[in-house]
Design a protein with these regions (language model features):
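Acyltransferase/transacylase module recognition
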Residues: 1-116, 266, 270-370
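Short polar catalytic/cofactor-binding loops
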Residues: 18-25, 187-190, 409-411
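Solvent-exposed alpha-helices and their adjacent loops that cap or buttress functional pockets
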Residues: 7-10, 111-113, 173-176, 200-201, ...
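Active-site entrance/lid segments in N-terminal catalytic domains of soluble metabolic enzymes
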Residues: 368-487
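Gly/Ala-rich beta-loop-alpha elbow adjacent to hydrolase catalytic centers
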Residues: 117-125, 129
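Alpha/beta catalytic cores of group-transfer enzymes, especially the acyltransferase/condensing modules
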Residues: 131-295, 299
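Short, aromatic/basic amphipathic alpha-helical patches
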Residues: 195-197, 232-233, 336-345, 473-480
Length: 487
């Protein structure tokens, strides 16, 4: 009996993953609303969330300036534009993730029944995590409807409270090209912290908001402070490049990739502490679960996100070679972040961010591609009558232990060490760079013939960086092929 991939997830270890800010949520929403039933359901949830917010509607309107229409933004995969504003984006991202869960249920995948091993939320993706857990607890999306509407409403409160707070702080969402969040890729945490310390007269704290991997961090703060940090990074790059040019410094020159995120708030920053309190206050006026509201607001606005650790925790929860992580978006940025963390583990990262991708998975009989499992290349120990032996690709190819004596002038020009290594059963190379005349070569080969045991072999290592050696060894004189042909 054929079982499609989406159905198989119910019996295989898997995790769901949801993206956060600066992702193309209007594109995802426009895609979802092409399905009439999904469009109707999403509009119904938004209307219900708005009704729940009636007690604080005047406060919200004072912040947004006009009612927010989540369905009215022009989808643009390259740029969010006005849709980046937190008064729309926090709820908008969460809405598309609810849409993905609704679509999965229409296709036969129920979160409540499949019980994923984990549900991961990157940054504000934690809102979708709470949605998924609410569905699991209630048994279905329909049964969890009231909780889902409340979480959507809390998302709107978080965006409005954060926006109100940055205005109180005088934090502009733009300072030239700078925004309140800066991605720094290609730098360790220690290097990032060193750059932070070099920013003089900062207007506020510069915090590491998100740790995507060991060398990819996202900072939050005033845009002008982040712009100053970017200048410090450029100065450090030029300083190290000069030292390298002068041959005073080795290694890789510090050269991180910097990218400002398209956001209007410094998410995951102590600057947002008062916004958390404002969110909880509004939630209380609406009669919401204040403990859950505080937890959500702190996760989105205040707390550091160690995405690297969250993903790696899955390695111990299940056999990585059997685990699937399903990226539900919006956009495919999160799948790339996951891929960077899980490379070499064999974990399968599955993109399910669009109606088309999810539909394909619902009829897929084969398996999606997994990441390469580097354990397949690890050495193995086998027991033989001659004792324990190490097996590698090299040993299978050559029949010799995975240790070699490389041809390197001047060390292996003389034959004694080469013969000793070969007689001990190792791959041994005679350095061609030192065989500078036919007489020298013949003398060394004669010594090898005397010292090598019967059946032992050596390899000739040659790098032809000048025409003389090429002509001597393999060109017109051909001293090496002739010696090989003679046995």
């Amino acid at each position: 009996m054929t079982t499609f991939f989406l159905n198989r997830l119910a019996t295989e270890p898997h995790a769901l993953a949801f993206a956060g800010q600066s992702t193309p949520w209007p594109v995802a929403l426009a895609d979802q609303t092409t399905d009439p039933s999904l469009d109707e359901a999403l509009r119904g949830h938004v209307a219900a969330a708005n009704r729940l917010l009636a007690p604080v509607a005047a406060d919200l309107l004072a912040t947004t300036g006009r009612p927010v229409d989540l369905f009215g933004f022009t989808p643009n995969p390259a740029r969010l534009g006005a849709a980046a504003d937190a008064t729309a984006s926090v709820e908008g991202v969460a809405l598309t993730q609810l849409g993905a869960l609704l679509d999965l249920e229409h296709l036969g995948y129920s979160v409540a029944q499949a019980k994923p091993l984990a549900v991961l939320g990157h940054s504000q993706g934690v809102l979708a995590v709470h949605m998924a857990r609410a569905i699991e607890a209630a048994g279905s999306i329909e049964a969890a409807g009231k909780t889902l509407d409340e979480i959507l409403a809390v998302a709107a409160l978080i965006g409005a409270a954060g926006t109100r707070r940055v205005r109180e702080l005088g934090l502009s969402p733009k300072y030239g090209e700078a925004s309140p969040m800066l991605s720094v890729k290609g730098a360790t945490r220690e290097q990032v912290e060193a750059l932070v310390k070099r920013v003089n007269n900062a207007r506020g704290p510069i915090s590491i908001a998100v740790t995507n991997s060991d060398n990819h961090h996202v900072l939050s703060g005033y845009p002008e402070d982040l712009a100053a940090l970017a200048l410090e990074a450029e100065r450090e790059h030029k300083h190290q490049a000069k030292l390298r040019e002068q041959k005073l410094h080795g290694g890789t020159v510090f050269n991180p990739t910097l990218e400002y995120l398209e956001v209007t708030l410094p998410f995951h920053s102590p600057l947002m502490a008062e916004a958390v309190e404002q969110t909880v206050s509004w939630a209380g006026a609406c009669g919401f679960d204040q403990d859950r509201t505080r937890a959500l607001a702190e996760e989105v606005l205040l707390n550091h996100v160690d995405w690297n650790a969250r993903v790696k925790a899955l390695f111990n929860a299940a056999d990585p070679a059997k685990l699937w992580i399903v990226d539900l978006g919006p956009g495919n940025t999160l799948g790339k972040l996951i891929g960077n963390v899980v490379q070499g583990t064999g974990i399968g990262v599955v993109e399910a961010t669009t109606l088309s991708e999810r539909s394909t998975l619902s009829t897929l009989e084969s398996e999606p591609e997994r990441t390469q499992n580097w354990k397949a290349f690890a050495p193995r120990v086998i027991n033989t009558p001659a004792g324990a032996k190490l097996v590698t690709k090299f040993s299978k190819l050559t029949g010799k232990p995975p240790v070699l004596l490389p041809g390197m002038t001047p060390t292996t020009v003389e034959p004694e060490i080469v013969a000793a290594a070969a007689n001990a059963g190792y791959w041994a190379e005679l350095a061609g760079g030192g065989q500078v005349t036919a007489e020298v070569f013949d003398r060394h080969i004669a010594a090898l013939e005397d010292e090598l045991e019967e059946g032992r072999t050596v390899e000739f290592n040659a790098m032809f960086m000048d025409r003389y050696l090429w002509n001597l060894q393999f060109g017109s004189s051909r001293i090496v092929p002739k010696k090989r042909a003679s046995g």
